[in-house]
Amino acid sequence: MPELPDVVVYLEALSRFIVGKRLERLKLLSPFVLRSVDPSIDSINQQIVRGLRRIGKRIVLEFGRDLFLVIHLMIAGRLRWREPGKKPGMGPKQILAAFEFGDGTLFFTEASSKKRASIQLVKGEESLKALDPGGLEPLEATLDQFRDALRRESHTVKRSLTDPHILSGIGNAYSDEILHTAKLSPLKLTRSLNDDEIVRLYDAMRATLRVWIDQLRNDVRDGFPEKVTAFHNAMAVHGRYKQPCPVCGSPVQRIAYADNECNYCARCQTGGKLLADRSLSRLLKGDWPKSIDELNQ
């Protein structure tokens, strides 16, 4: 799922490619993509794209008449810019919508059969605000605001980082990287964090997001993001199960869930303790190793 760094770079590219230009026509190519009825989606045809915003992981296109088009990429949604006559590079069933401009087309695609990605058209600032879960902006929040938000309820640190009601725009991938940088267990409870750990987490969050925004900007340069992914070779732990941690060399571990997994380094983050994997630990029961040292025996 595209997260804050990915969406920031998308917005910067969209600013170069479509802001100030007239949307000739929006073609909806999937019956599932539109999640709003009023105002009519046709009301933005022939309108100028006046600006862009980000609401968490959502991309907002601003039009006249107080209209806002909200694009939610979800897990497999992507945006692709093509010059006139160029194909989107995806099968027809994966193309959700086409934003046609005079000098090219912005394709909204989804490489999944679940069809979770969506478009909504809303009118007015209040309607737009209603779509915002209200989490803090990670790069704008003060340390005190961050501390208060984390301690408001007792959740695992992993859950709090990815909860859009607490923090805006962070998902599974960058939360893994943040926690590795902060040297914190993903399952540590937020109310058990001491002041030093909160400072470490705050600093790690800001540093990680900034590093990856810069990295993705450097990859895209003046073009359009084409390889938006949750997995990067330069990541420390995310998507690197069984590969060596770049800090200590221990194999990266995982906690498997239904749709994804949490990756961490037991040596760097949990004092060597292996966190229970919901599938394997139940299967192995008493044979489940409790530490990274037992695993390596």
Residue ranges and their predicted role:
Residues M1-K129, R267-L275, S279-Q297:
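Acidic, proline/glycine-enriched N-terminal capping motif
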Residues R22-S40, R53, R58, L79, ...:
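Basic, nucleic-acid-binding surfaces and adjacent catalytic neighborhoods in DNA/RNA-processing proteins
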Residues F63, L69-L184, L189-S192, D196, ...:
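Phosphate/anion-contacting hairpin/loop surfaces
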